[in-house]
Amino acid sequence: MKVTCSWPTTPLYQAYHDYEWGRPIHDDQHQFEHLCLESLQCGLSWLTILNKREIIRQCFEHFNVDAVAQYTETDIERIMSTDGMLKSRKKIEAIINNAQAFQRIQDEFGSFCEYIWAFTNHKTLIYEGHSEGRMPAKNELSTRISKDLKKRGFKFVGPVTIYSHLQASGLINDHGKDCPCFNEINEANPVVYMTIDD
């Protein structure tokens, strides 16, 4: 696949761009994985997260939310001592906390996917102007979801982190219009065009 988005600069980045980024996620395990990875990325490059992704997966049992929600101090120490793993105790504790909050959303809405996709009426959003270089770090939608998640007890879910999550999990299609992925996603999923300020 020819990559026309400008940011994939390594083969690993390119594979992530081509086969994951922006493609709608409708299962809770992958939603939880992407949310955790975005939270871990705070202050780091995304390439760092991709390079450590398999180690992170192993540490968190492939993001089994029910398992992670029950982690104790012993698990935190295990993760902290894993070679190659990120050593931020606060972020590790936040993932455990977020797993518990994630479960509460599942209990209330039936699934996390039902909860988060309801914010876009179960459609992928396409914002006018984003593919012309006017892509924001956050927007009104990510700010609204961030506030709601924080109210529900989530941590490390600021508006910028949530905007990145919305892009990664396909609630927003921010591929460039000339990128093959842009049309692939639009043709396979219900979409709605938004103005830049919506």
Can you say where each PLM-predicted feature lies in the sequence?
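HhH-family (HhH-GPD) DNA N-glycosylase catalytic core used in base-excision repair
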Residues: 1-198
